[in-house]
């Protein structure tokens, strides 16, 4: 028992130490830096200021933040529209086949997402496979310009984040009470009524979780907008990258990071509140 207790203590201390060293302290440094200034040599100056946060209200940066939210929202809706039927299809397959398709869904995670975006860029380029195939079919006369447009950024985000939508949806759909669906059909409910009044409410936790897992990282995937969208389709993640690596304005980059973290925190709070309300509603029913 003593050895077990010592082992548990060592594990707990190790985990806490790791979190403090690599999570708490770095975030504390970022928060502190966001309230400082920089000098002419681009070094952080120990002078307190709120200017870094007020700069975010500048139309240029505020527009990028709103654009990031819009792009993340569109990508989330696209993932939901594509992911829900796919998750439903997975659940309806025989149990022997499901593990194989789930494995194929997870396989892309074994490859770096940056490499996958490079592959997608080649596929969608003016001289890429998609345009060449459509020209061969005679569907188009001249190559379609897809790259370096907002649509290309959306395609890239959906390509990277779709599995994050499918997995929670699959879990929720798999847990559906089949006798309840059969009872609805026996009582005369149409397929549309069954879907809107029973299936959607019961799978809402999976929908909310999937939307959250897609929307939160979508605003920060700067390399997707860099490679697919170009300079005219920046996300807030690109602003943070430029401030830290190019301009070396660390205080403003830190303030932008904290603002993005707060936005994500508000989304998590909304998810938590929505989950509680849904659970209460289910308990009452």
Spell out what each predicted region is.
Residues 26-33, 38-39, 115-117, 165-168, ...:
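Non-cytoplasmic
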Residues 41, 50, 117-158, 192, ...:
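Membrane-interfacial helix termini and adjacent extracytoplasmic/periplasmic loops
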Residues 15-24, 103, 107, 159, ...:
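Transmembrane alpha-helices
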Residues 2-8, 39, 53-60, 218, ...:
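Interhelical loop and adjacent transmembrane-helix boundary motif
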Residues 1-30, 99, 103, 261:
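N-terminal signal-anchor/first transmembrane alpha helix
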Residues 59-92:
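Transmembrane alpha-helix signature in integral membrane proteins
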Residues 2-5, 10-13, 36, 170-185, ...:
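C-terminal transmembrane helix and the adjacent membrane-cytosol boundary/short C-terminal tail
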Residues 24-61, 123, 127-128, 230, ...:
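Short membrane-interfacial helix/loop motifs at transmembrane-helix boundaries
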């Amino acid at each position: 028992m003593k050895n077990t207790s010592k082992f548990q203590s060592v594990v707990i201390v190790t985990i806490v130490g790791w979190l403090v060293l690599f999570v708490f302290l770095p975030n504390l440094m970022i928060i502190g830096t966001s309230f400082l200034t920089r000098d002419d040599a681009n070094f952080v100056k120990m002078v307190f200021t709120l200017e870094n946060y007020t700069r975010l209200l500048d139309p240029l940066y505020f527009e990028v933040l709103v654009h990031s939210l819009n792009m993340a929202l569109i990508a989330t809706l696209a993932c939901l529209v594509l992911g829900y039927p796919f998750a439903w299809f997975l659940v309806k397959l025989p149990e022997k086949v499901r593990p194989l398709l789930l494995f194929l869904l997870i396989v892309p995670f074994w490859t770096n997402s940056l490499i996958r975006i490079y592959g997608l860029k080649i596929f969608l380029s003016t001289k890429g496979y998609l345009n060449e195939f459509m020209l061969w079919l005679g569907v188009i006369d001249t190559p379609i310009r897809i790259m370096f447009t907002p649509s290309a950024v959306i395609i890239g985000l959906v390509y990277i984040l779709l599995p994050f939508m499918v997995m929670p949806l699959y879990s929720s759909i798999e847990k559906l009470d089949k006798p309840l669906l059969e009872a609805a059909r026996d009582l005369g409910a149409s397929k549309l009524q069954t879907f809107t009044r029973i299936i959607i409410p019961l799978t809402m936790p999976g929908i909310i979780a999937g939307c959250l897992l897609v929307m939160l990282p979508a605003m920060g995937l700067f390399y997707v907008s860099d490679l697919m969208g170009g300079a005219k389709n920046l996300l807030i993640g690109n602003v943070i990258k430029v401030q830290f690596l190019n301009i070396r304005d660390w205080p403003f980059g830190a303030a932008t990071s904290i603002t993005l973290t707060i936005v994500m925190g508000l989304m998590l709070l909304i998810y938590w509140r929505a989950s509680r309300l849904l659970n209460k509603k289910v308990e009452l029913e």
